[in-house]
């Protein structure tokens, strides 16, 4: 298990100074200085000899939502022990369902589901904003997820402050929006940090980089909330920031898109400088633009995130300021307004040749609704998109839905599409270098009652371990050819952060096991010796 990196967090005053400095730097140079001192670890092992690193790769993730206690905690005010038990249950479920990543909502409304000197504790933990839950949920989640072989991605909402409660007076005294009321824009029954304020952009980048620097997260994630979804013709009142900062633009929409573009680029740059193995991705609304508006848009007729939320996802893909996109394709196949197949095709074409991964946001929460009935409601989606060359996996909203109303549908999906575990996608930042871990040694495999217990020695720099079982006709040969035969998708038994794994599949005589290490970039290390099974 990789330890959680801890460091002394900056003070609020220091962050305010840094925010001002960063805002100036952004305006002058177009980049941020976060994490400039961090470097990649030294290469510790030769390249994996088999040349097939990647053929088991697939994102299988689920969102774990904290806002309004949608998933976790089940209600505010639970004890620390009760919250940890619920979180353990979700992580156990994710691992048991064959998932390999959880996207934990750590900043739902400019507050924190982790120990922060910058923003107050989220109200969804204790029932009161600023209430200390008595432990650090993110620190705990990272450690427990990694032990189970799950990536833990930190999910942030960059601008949202009040969710059905825009009154600044209801925020705790130390909330950044109350300390800086000029940052806040009320909109309907919500409130948002103004994306047009450079200090807001610098603040948000600082908050995110604080988490990246202090926690061993695998990714940083945004969902579909940028400028707010339109509400009955109501205008987002950013006149003040437009007048002060929009001078270089003739069109306010272009200026708003540029504000969001700058945030995306600055976050990506900061992560690359600090921890390049940490992925940064976005799950936008599923429609960029309709082809009736833009001939290069999708064959659809719904809300356009480019125009409604000023989120130019296509630009982020083409400019490489995101590592992946996970568009929310929450529509069934054959839906006239936005057909699932047409939308999957469009996004697949958009990422082609860019190096940006594509994961499909899947609507587990809709199972049971009209058009989403039947045990094949989810599987039929993957029947199509799972065969598209540009699709690298799926993320499900949400983990609670997978356990509850979508449980039967997910079981059918897993049987059809997830018969074997999958390694998480490898970071493109590792291209051009070999894996940073060596071969796994000391592997033993001992047979018991309907089980084989596989154990091995820890490897420096290993984030996860992948365990493979060789078929009987290749085990025991000990040759490089036999070892390479082992590290194939159909032989993967499991992925874990521990140095032991139990295989309960029926054992053939003569089968053996191979264990490989995955580094921070999720690159797979060299293949070691085959361990024969002993009684």
Could you describe each region identified by the protein language model?
Residues 503-525:
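Beta-strand-rich modules
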Residues 85-111, 214-219, 321-322:
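Catalytic domains of carbohydrate-active enzymes, especially glycoside hydrolases
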Residues 28-48:
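C-terminal region of N-terminal signal peptides and the immediate post-cleavage residues
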Residues 97-133:
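Aromatic-lined carbohydrate-binding/catalytic grooves of carbohydrate-active enzymes
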Residues 408-461, 521-535:
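Pro/Thr/Ser/Gly-rich low-complexity, intrinsically disordered linker/stalk tracts
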Residues 56-57, 65-85, 154, 159-214, ...:
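Active-site-adjacent "subsite" loops/lids of carbohydrate-active enzymes
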Residues 310-336, 347-433:
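Substrate-binding cleft of secreted/luminal carbohydrate-active enzymes
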Residues 107, 148, 178-287, 291-321, ...:
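Polysaccharide-binding and catalytic clefts of secreted carbohydrate-active enzymes
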């Amino acid at each position: 298990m990789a330890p959680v990196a801890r460091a002394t967090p900056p003070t609020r005053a220091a962050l305010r100074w840094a925010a001002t400095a960063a805002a100036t730097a952004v305006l002058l140079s177009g980049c941020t200085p976060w994490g400039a001192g961090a470097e990649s670890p030294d290469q510790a092992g030769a390249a994996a000899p088999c040349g097939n690193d990647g053929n088991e790769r697939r994102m299988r993730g689920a969102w774990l939502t904290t806002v309004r206690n949608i998933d976790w905690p089940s209600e505010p005010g639970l004890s620390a022990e009760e919250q940890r038990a619920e979180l353990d249950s979700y992580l156990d479920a994710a691992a048991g369902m064959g998932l390999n990543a959880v996207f934990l909502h750590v900043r739902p409304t400019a507050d924190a589901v982790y120990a922060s000197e910058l923003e107050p504790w989220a109200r969804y933990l204790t029932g009161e904003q600023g209430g200390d839950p008595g432990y650090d949920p993110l620190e705990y989640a990272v450690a427990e997820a990694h032990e189970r072989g799950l990536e833990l991605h930190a999910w942030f909402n960059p601008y949202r402050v009040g969710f059905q409660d825009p009154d600044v007076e209801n925020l705790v005294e130390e909330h950044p929006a109350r300390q800086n009321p000029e940052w806040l824009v009320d909109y309907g029954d919500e409130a948002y940090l103004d994306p047009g304020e450079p200090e807001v952009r610098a603040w948000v980048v600082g908050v995110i980089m604080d988490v990246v620097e202090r926690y061993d997260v695998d990714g940083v994630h945004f969902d579909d909330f940028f400028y707010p979804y339109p509400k009955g013709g109501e205008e987002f009142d950013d006149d003040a920031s437009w007048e002060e900062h929009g001078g270089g633009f003739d069109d306010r929409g272009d200026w708003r898109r540029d504000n969001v573009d700058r945030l995306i680029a600055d976050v990506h740059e900061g992560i690359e400088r600090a921890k390049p193995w940490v992925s940064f991705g976005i799950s936008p609304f599923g429609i960029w633009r309709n082809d009736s508006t833009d001939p290069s848009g999708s064959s659809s007729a719904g809300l356009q995130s480019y125009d409604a939320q000023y989120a130019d996802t296509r630009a982020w893909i083409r400019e490489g300021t995101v590592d992946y996109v996970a568009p929310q394709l929450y529509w069934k196949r054959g839906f006239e307004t936005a057909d699932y197949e047409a939308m999957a095709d469009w996004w697949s074409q958009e990422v082609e040749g860019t190096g940006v991964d594509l994961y499909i946001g899947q609507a587990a929460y809709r199972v049971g609704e009209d058009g989403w009935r039947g045990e094949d409601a989810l599987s039929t989606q993957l029947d199509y998109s799972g065969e598209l060359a540009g699709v690298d996996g799926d993320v499900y909203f949400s983990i609670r839905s997978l356990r509850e109303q979508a449980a039967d549908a997910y079981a059918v999906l897993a049987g059809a599409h997830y018969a074997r575990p999958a390694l998480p996608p490898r970071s493109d930042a590792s291209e051009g270098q070999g894996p940073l871990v060596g071969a796994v040694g000391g592997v033993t495999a001992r047979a018991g009652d309907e089980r084989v217990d596989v154990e091995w020695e820890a490897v420096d720099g290993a984030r996860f371990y992948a365990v493979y079982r060789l078929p009987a006709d290749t085990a025991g040969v000990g040759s490089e050819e036999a070892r390479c035969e082992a590290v194939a998708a159909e032989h993967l038994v499991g992925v874990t952060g521990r140095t032991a794994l139990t295989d309960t599949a029926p054992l053939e005589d003569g089968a053996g096991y191979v264990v490989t290490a995955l580094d921070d970039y999720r690159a797979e290390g060299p293949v070691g010796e085959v361990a024969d099974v002993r009684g």
